[in-house]
């Protein structure tokens, strides 16, 4: 889909559905006024050679009418750099024009230890594209899995020219904990890119990477200021006294505004009948985990009416894997319960009878894989 505006601060259109299948669409506007869309797609069933076989397609794009031009689609990458090696999940394509030539950069290898970034070149936006002889230009696949403080699964990248005239690449990666679990999820990283030769190369993109907080030259570090979210070590405290909810709080499968009410006493959550075990919108505010070591706490006033009512805090991977720590009712009594859901099966780890006349503070502390 496409949404558009003349002012990025407001006036965005309703989503415009583009008529093709696949994932990761990217628009390219050429300097001659023409435009194109590239995206990942599955090959025709009769042409699928192995599991994970995917293609990159390109379409002419009608800017005036916000649609792809029917019948203009063409496969410009089949499988990946070398289909004979059965590469998987070629995706996330972007086209760049430099010195009169067209460069197609894609992710290859799938979200995991074989993830990488590869690049192709052509004299025409619709190909044919030839792969660089130094592919991949970014990956962590060749290094020991047990290396310390690692960044892994590097790929799914994009390029930008910075205010210093140099190129930089942003890409996705992970910072797994000591048991190789990815509780912080996929995150965005940045590296300088050397494009002094024919092809761009991520500097340090082919050596073992470690997370740092260096900023590109010429860029002011506004982390935690002027609306930018903090990074590194920090304390975030929200008493919900503002009339507008902080953007760091997010909803799941639906807008948070559907269940939050900012009152003079703080935040009031209007509960849905669904819960976090279901694949439905839930009346839950989430804060994305940014650290492998952290402490988080919430203070609430809550008096459940029956055994179906439950409120508290959660450490949430998805609807099948999570912890909940909160208050419910059994008979005439109120209980504080710690419950774990694993593979969709819930089990109570502990419970204690409590009074609900005063506010209750719930806290979780994480240290690597221990919560």
Could you tell me what each predicted segment is?
Residues 1-371:
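Carbohydrate-active catalytic/glycan-binding domains of CAZyme proteins
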